[in-house]
Amino acid sequence: MARRDALTGKSALSGQSRSHALNATKRKWNLNLQKVRVMNENGSVFNIKVSARTLRTLKKQEKIV
């Protein structure tokens, strides 16, 4: 399963770490994924993985069970 936000589609970013000598090493910035139970418009409940930022938005919209 891909490390991807189920609602927004966000995934990890890639880039380089730079030391003091400016040596480049590839690295990834992963999402802070959380499992959460969500209720849709029909009232059915299901589990999805969302990022912490999306989780804050869902809590604000009161969509979390």
UniProtKB/Swiss-Prot annotation:
InterPro entries: Bacterial_rp_bL28 (IPR050096), Ribosomal_bL28 (IPR026569), Ribosomal_bL28/bL31-like_sf (IPR034704), Ribosomal_bL28_bact-type (IPR001383), Ribosomal_bL28_sf (IPR037147). Transmembrane segments: none annotated. GO terms for molecular function: structural constituent of ribosome. Residues 1-26 are annotated as: Disordered. GO terms for cellular component: ribonucleoprotein complex; ribosome. It holds the Pfam family Ribosomal_L28. Residues 11-22 have a biased composition (Polar residues). The keyword RNA-binding does not apply. Gene3D superfamilies: Ribosomal protein L28/L24 (2.30.170.40). GO terms for biological process: translation. Keywords: Ribonucleoprotein, Ribosomal protein. It comes from the Bacteria. The keyword Ribonucleoprotein applies. HAMAP family: Ribosomal_bL28 (MF_00373). Belongs to the bacterial ribosomal protein bL28 family. PANTHER family: 50S RIBOSOMAL PROTEIN L28, LARGE RIBOSOMAL SUBUNIT PROTEIN BL28A. This is Large ribosomal subunit protein bL28. It comes from Mycoplasma mycoides subsp. mycoides SC (strain CCUG 32753 / NCTC 10114 / PG1).
